């Protein structure tokens, strides 16, 4: 959707011109899965699929939201002074949460607004449509009300919304990748200190293919919070001898030495994934910087194996995509990305082999799962931004 289409769509819905238009990307994560809430490193990148917005300030206390993705819901009206979670308000709860926490942080949002939203991130795909929406609302509020915010402020508000308004105990990676993204750069982020580096994503003759299982995953209703609790319990058990805050502080040798302290086989597996995935992420960044794409690809594969066997968050659909991808010509590596339990995988594929890859993986997946996957070539692009002003 281009800027003119956005402006026209806003005019069609609300009968007035928008003050500004906006875009907030989705994200993929190259490696470093389920490490963000374990104090480890992640390596995400913002993509050109995302959420578009157009907005206009009102002079009363009414918020009016419309999504082209949920046309059947029509315009949802919300009282600016009653920003509480209400299931009936559907997707606008994300917007309400962001505005609530902005206000609580002392930012003056004294009138309502009208917001048109259109997203081309497949819903429930694990490409962070919710974090994309949170950051979109954040930059809309920043622009319309002249708020003085750093981008990190908005990233933290997005995470706060996810954790304390929506009720998902997620880490900061998604919002960070979406807020801080840059063209052709991946973000190497230490989720403990929030120190980060923009690393050039030079894959030579290879491209990143997003593989969508087309099996929707619901993060809040999944085993995501259970995995987090298992890791927190493992830290507690390790601290009978050690003194750590998170699993991300350990290397594999220290973990092996003290894993006997963890009293449950499943918790040992969960913790082992968190520790080793963090180490893989450190190695992957080094490999990428040295142009060693073969090693980078092997680490990506190893990440999936660990998520499948130790963290157990993949399932038939994601495993079929990854395992089939590994067998294809021109593939450096493939794995699930995001929280798992459905959603998407990524594959690093030679650009001349992309069509054959899609055909072969699609055919096998359809035979095994019973319906077709979708494929998109990911372009790595900048973070949430204003597209145009009136």
UniProtKB/Swiss-Prot annotation:
Keyword terms: ATP-binding, Carbohydrate metabolism, Cytoplasm, Galactose metabolism, Kinase, Magnesium, Metal-binding, Nucleotide-binding, Transferase
Subcellular location, record wording: Cytoplasm
GO-annotated biological processes: galactose metabolic process
Binding annotation for ATP: 67, 124-130
UniProt-listed PROSITE patterns: GALACTOKINASE, GHMP_KINASES_ATP
Site entry: Transition state stabilizer: 27
GO MF, one example: galactokinase activity
Top-level division of the source organism's lineage: Bacteria
Residues that hold substrate according to the record: 33-36, 224
Nucleotide-binding found in the keyword field: yes
Keyword Metal-binding set for record: yes
Main enzyme class: transferase
Record's GO cellular component terms: cytosol
Function according to Swiss-Prot or TrEMBL: Catalyzes the transfer of the gamma-phosphate of ATP to D-galactose to form alpha-D-galactose-1-phosphate (Gal-1-P).
Family of this protein: Belongs to the GHMP kinase family. GalK subfamily.
Protein name: Galactokinase
Organism of provenance: Streptococcus suis (strain 05ZYH33)
């Amino acid at each position: 959707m281009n800027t003119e289409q956005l402006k026209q769509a806003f005019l069609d819905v609300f009968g007035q011109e928008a003050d500004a238009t906006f875009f907030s990307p989705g994200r993929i994560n190259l490696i470093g899965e389920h490490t963000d809430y374990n104090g480890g490193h992640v390596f995400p990148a913002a993509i050109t699929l995302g959420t578009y917005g157009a907005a206009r300030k009102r002079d009363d206390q009414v918020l009016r939201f419309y999504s082209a993705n949920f046309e059947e819901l029509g315009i949802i009206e919300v009282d600016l002074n009653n920003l509480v979670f209400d299931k009936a308000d559907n997707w606008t709860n994300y917007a309400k949460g962001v505005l609530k926490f902005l206000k609580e942080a002392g930012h003056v949002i004294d009138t309502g607004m009208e917001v048109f939203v259109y997203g081309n991130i497949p819903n429930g795909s694990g490409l962070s449509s919710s974090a994309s929406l949170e950051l979109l609302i954040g930059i809309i509020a920043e622009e319309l009300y002249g708020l003085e915010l750093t981008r990190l402020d908005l990233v933290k508000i997005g995470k706060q919304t996810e954790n304390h308004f929506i009720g998902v105990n997620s880490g900061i990676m998604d919002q960070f990748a979406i807020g801080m993204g840059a063209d052709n750069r991946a973000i190497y982020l230490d989720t403990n200190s929030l120190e980060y580096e923009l690393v050039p994503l030079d894959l030579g003759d290879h491209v990143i293919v997003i593989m969508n299982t087309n099996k929707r995953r619901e993060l809040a209703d999944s085993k995501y919070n259970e995995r987090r609790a298992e890791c927190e319990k493992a830290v507690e058990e390790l601290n009978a001898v050690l003194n750590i805050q998170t699993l991300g502080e350990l290397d594999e040798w220290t973990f092996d030495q003290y894993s006997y302290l963890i009293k449950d086989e499943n918790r040992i597996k969960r913790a082992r994934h968190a520790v080793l995935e963090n180490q893989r992420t450190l190695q992957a960044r080094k490999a990428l910087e040295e142009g060693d794409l073969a090693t980078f690809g092997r680490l990506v594969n190893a990440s999936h194996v660990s998520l499948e066997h130790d963290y157990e968050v993949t399932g038939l659909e994601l495993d079929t995509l990854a395992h089939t991808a590994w067998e294809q010509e021109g593939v450096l590596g493939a794995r699930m990305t995001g929280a798992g339990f459905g959603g998407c995988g990524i594959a690093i594929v030679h650009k001349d082999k992309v069509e054959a890859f899609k055909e072969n993986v699609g055919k096998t997946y359809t035979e095994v799962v019973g319906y077709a996957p979708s494929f998109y070539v990911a372009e790595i692009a900048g973070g949430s931004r204003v597209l145009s002003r009136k």
